Amino acid sequence: MFTESMLFLLLFLLLGLIAKNNSLIIAVAVVILLKLFHVDGKVMEMVQAKGINWGVTIITVAILIPIATGQIGFKDLIDSFKSAAGWIGLGAGIAVSILAKKGVSYMAVDPQVTVSLVFGTILAVVLFRGIAAGPVIAAGIAYMAMQLVAFIK
C-alpha cells in the first residue's frame, strides 16, 4: 500500500491540506482512490491522456455560461474592442493558445519535462495559491500587460 507513488501522493495531499487548496485536495484524493481500488491501468492512461482536454472543456463551458444566460451579448463583445484591455485580452488569449499548442507538442517530444511541470504547478498551487488552469493564465497575462500600460501612462 505504501509504495513510492502512494507516499508521493500523500505528500501532495498534506501540502494541499496545509495550503487549504480544495482543488489539489480533491484531485489527490481522487487519484488515491483510483489507486486504492486498483482501477484498471487503461482507465488511468485514458484520464492521463484526455484529462487536460476534459478540464479545458469544463472551463470553456463555464466561460460560455454568461453568454447563454444573456449576461454577455454582442454589444459587450463590440464594446470590449473599444478599450486597450479588450485588445490586450484578445492578444493574450491568442498567445496562450499558441503557447499551449507548442507546450503540448514539446511534452510529446520530451515527456521528462512533464515531471517538472507537474511539480512546478503543484508548488505554485501550494506556495503561491496559484490555479492550474489555462484560460485563467490568459487573463493573468492580460492583467500584467494592463499594469504595464498603466505604468507607462
UniProtKB/Swiss-Prot annotation:
Keywords recorded for this protein, A-Z: Cell membrane, Membrane, Transmembrane, Transmembrane helix
UniProt KW rRNA-binding keyword: no
GO cellular component, one term: plasma membrane
Main location group: membrane
Locations listed in the record: Cell membrane
Entry's transmembrane regions: 6-26, 54-74, 80-100, 117-137
Domain of life the protein comes from: Bacteria
InterPro entries from the UniProt entry: UPF0756_TM (IPR007382)
Record's bilayer topology term: Multi-pass membrane protein
Key word Ribosomal protein present: no
HAMAP family hit by this protein: UPF0756 (MF_01874)
Similarity section: Belongs to the UPF0756 family.
Protein name per the record: UPF0756 membrane protein lwe1581
Organism for this UniProt entry: Listeria welshimeri serovar 6b (strain ATCC 35897 / DSM 20650 / CCUG 15529 / CIP 8149 / NCTC 11857 / SLCC 5334 / V8)
Lineage start: Bacteria, Bacillati, Bacillota, Bacilli, Bacillales
